[in-house]
Amino acid sequence: MSDKEAGVASSLGSNSPINKDEVDVKNTEEHSKQESKSDINKPPLKKIKADDGIDISDSFSRRENKGNNKVISSVYNDENKKTPAWMKSKTTDKYDKYGSRSTPIATPTAPVNNPDERYSKYMTNSVNSNDRVRRPPTETTSSQYDKKRAHDEAEDDVVAPYSNLAVANPSSNLYQTFQSHINNREGKDINSIVRSHYNQRTQQSKFQGSRTKSPIYKLRNFNNAIKYILLGNWVKPNPDSNRPTVILDLCCGKGGDLNKCEFVSVDQYIGIDISDASIKEAFSRYSRNKARFIPQTAESKKERDTRRYNFEACFATGDCFSSSIPEILEPNFPGIIDGLFPVDCVSLQFAMHYAFETEEKVHQLLTNVTKSLRAGGTLIGTIPSSDFIRDKIVNRAFIDQENRKFGNDLYSVTFHKDPPDEGVFRPPFGNGYNYSLKDAIDDVPEYVVPFEVFRGLCEEYGLVLKYKKNFIDIFNQEIPKYFSKLNKNLIEGMKRSDGKYGAEGLEKEAVGFYIGFVFEKLGN
């Protein structure tokens, strides 16, 4: 005990215990009095002004900042330290089969046109992008721009549907055929036009009325039957029974082929399309009809409910003619390339004619296809027939000679420039025309696909032709085998005026415009 504490204790009496709190309080009061006395004798503090030339930056910090503090090293900032094993990525080589992968670097937030080096093998460098066929932009002065701006800023993709018409009522017997509204077509590239067109089509289709009232109802059923036949004959299950059967649907649209994928009993579906509205509709369609329990064993798969989708599905928005498959899928579905690729089938329905705008796009598409397919896997597609187009040109079967247009009341093809008299297009890329199909496609630019050129390019990518026929021949030869397998409503929707089934009249010429094809990837 200190002398001071002893003195306090004695003043309280020898029998009184020392109260520590009381001692502390008294000591504190005494110390405060001494400080107040010393403060009186101190000179007043001098006020520091900004213009006194004194550095006061350190005065605002509570920490001692003498500039000689030792920096603690860390594995995050010491280059001499080795990265611990737990921090190393296990997937640094996950895209080696698609191409070399360099260390990612910081990129500016503004979009740039430089290709991602990680997917160099997925990209095609053989064609100069400056050679791309572009639509010449219209010359617009600043004053004209100001006048047009308010109108053009109305987004093409969200044109108001037929909500003000009686046809918006589901009980109405009226039907409104589809019409697109795309601003400034001449100043837009094909991607923008196609995206806007199909976004509008997706939105307006909800308000058109019953599809059975469509002027191309029978034609749609016919085309669907062709796709059932092609997929039914050529989707081959994975030879490894432990692997799922996977189909990659490029340019999948609104998911119109989901029923066909259930028909061929796939286990996994991957859909990609350039139209975000179409992708949303495809996902919605899948979600509404997905089976509650997905069969996982061979026995349960035999008892799958074909009225529901007994397969898993994922959807992504992307341009498979300009971007690699990993670039489109991996950001939204990490690990999907390792988990589901290579796939058993790539489906490309009514879309490849958009790629033939440039050779670069075709090479990118075929790179995506061959890198995605397993050996023995198939590429199944439908495209306009270059033979059909050539015959129309050679026979001068134009309904409008001046405008270079052929077709009928259901469909039409209008060339951008005079086609060659012999119907053979050289060079084979960028030979454009505008295609219209009543209630489906409204004057959208497409490009001639010279099939032998396409076939030669496929062979360069290890894809060999297995099947090629026009729609009429496919139907006549294959429909007897599928007549009892297809949905009754689909079959009845193809009934002709003579009681038989198939296409007739204007519809027959419109469906004759297309062919179906199948390529198989070579390899062991």
From Swiss-Prot:
- List all Polar residues biased stretches: 68-77, 100-112
According to the entry, every stretch annotated as the mRNA cap 0 methyltransferase domain falls at: 214-522
Q: Where does S-adenosyl-L-methionine bind?
A: K227, C251, D273, D319, Q349, Y354
Which residues make up the annotated site mRNA cap binding?
K254, K260, R285, H353, E446, Y514
Residues annotated as binding mRNA: N223, N224
Catalysis performed (reactions):
a 5'-end (5'-triphosphoguanosine)-ribonucleoside in mRNA + S-adenosyl-L-methionine = a 5'-end (N(7)-methyl 5'-triphosphoguanosine)-ribonucleoside in mRNA + S-adenosyl-L-homocysteine
Question: SUPFAM superfamilies attached here?
Answer: S-adenosyl-L-methionine-dependent methyltransferases
> Which Gene Ontology cellular-component terms appear in the entry?
cytosol; nucleus
Region annotation (Disordered) maps to 1-155
Reported function:
Responsible for methylating the 5'-cap structure of mRNAs.
Q: Which UniProt keywords apply?
A: Methyltransferase, mRNA capping, mRNA processing, Nucleus, RNA-binding, S-adenosyl-L-methionine, Transferase
Query: Localized where?
Result: Nucleus
Q: What class of enzyme is it?
A: transferase
EC number(s): the record gives: 2.1.1.56
Where does the UniProt entry say this protein principally localizes?
Answer: nucleus
Return the protein name.
mRNA cap guanine-N(7) methyltransferase
Renumbered to this chain, the signal peptide range is none
Q: Which InterPro entries match?
A: mRNA_G-N7_MeTrfase_dom (IPR004971), mRNA_G-N7_MeTrfase_euk (IPR016899), RG7MT1 (IPR039753), SAM-dependent_MTases_sf (IPR029063)
Composition bias, Basic and acidic residues? 19-40, 90-99
User: What Pfam families has UniProt attached to this entry?
Assistant: mRNA_G-N7_MeTrfase
